[in-house]
């Protein structure tokens, strides 16, 4: 009987730990100070978007002369745009402008992250892009965790194209493969 109580206590302890610290498992952000200076071999503009709830989203925006459109790149769940900016080169060399944002809690972006806020932030920037580009000139590119965000934003709009790089079928399904023994559906706060 004592083994059963001990086993149940360990199980409940794991579930509680996972629930309260799940962000440590899913996100590996690199935080940057506001005065950090990005360095890339091609010209860019740094943008800051102040969100209605007090959060702020930091982005980098590369432009080319006579652009064919813009690639809106939604990165994965690690580091910051400091290390992801290298992906701009391929698109710039093919005549596309390139915009990439950091999610809340990554890089210079600030605020509490949630699934709803990530989607709303990404949608806000998409709408900002439509002030300069018609939707048939916007390409949404989602990589890894960002593929879920890109797919959602694409479903709300009509971009020219949606590109998914190393996507996943279901965030819940991917996590459930490893911790199938937990009531995961009720434990996850972020299920992009």
Show which residues each predicted segment covers.
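An N-terminal hydrophobic leader/cap segment in hydrolases
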Residues: 3-50
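Short, flexible helix/strand-to-coil boundary loops that buttress conserved ligand/catalytic motifs
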Residues: 30, 84-85, 175
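Short, flexible hinge/linker loops that cap or flank conserved catalytic cores
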Residues: 40-41, 64-66, 132
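Short gly/ser/thr-rich secondary-structure transition/capping motifs
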Residues: 51-56, 188-192
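Membrane-embedded segments
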Residues: 52-128, 141, 147-148, 154
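Structural signature of beta-strand start/N-cap positions in the alpha/beta core
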Residues: 97, 137, 160-161
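Alpha/beta-hydrolase fold nucleophile elbow
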Residues: 133-144
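Hydrolase active-site cap/lid region
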Residues: 148-192
